[in-house]
Amino acid sequence: MINRKATAVWKGTGKEGTGTVSTQSTVLENTQYSFNTRFAEGKGTNPEELIAAAHASCFAMKLSFELNAAGFTADELNATATVTLDPAKGQVTKSAIELKAKVPSVSADQFAQIADKAKKECPISQLLNAEITLNAELLS
């Protein structure tokens, strides 16, 4: 088992308070988040942005492994995840992955099947209880 951790510290009320988030790797260290970073365009990060980063990076790495297992090596995988938060429900309802990929010698059908498998089997996809969509474009 591999364990990774992050710590969040929140002070004050939900709307007026502020928080910081730090990761074990220290890539994030006392990074600010607040109501305004989550529900407006305030300076700092927010949980949904961090989930999007986790999903995009996990998917790209999983796709690389799946392509390799099928005998292909990607020149580049550019994945962007957009996480949707429904404030009325107070829940993440969707993560949409946009992918642009350069993979020599793979057919469009092979690529679509491999990308779909990676979408379903990526550990972050499995963690999310939300709709997950994939728009994959194979570049020449």
Each model region followed by its residue ranges:
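Extended beta-strand/beta-hairpin segments
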Residues: 1-53, 60-140
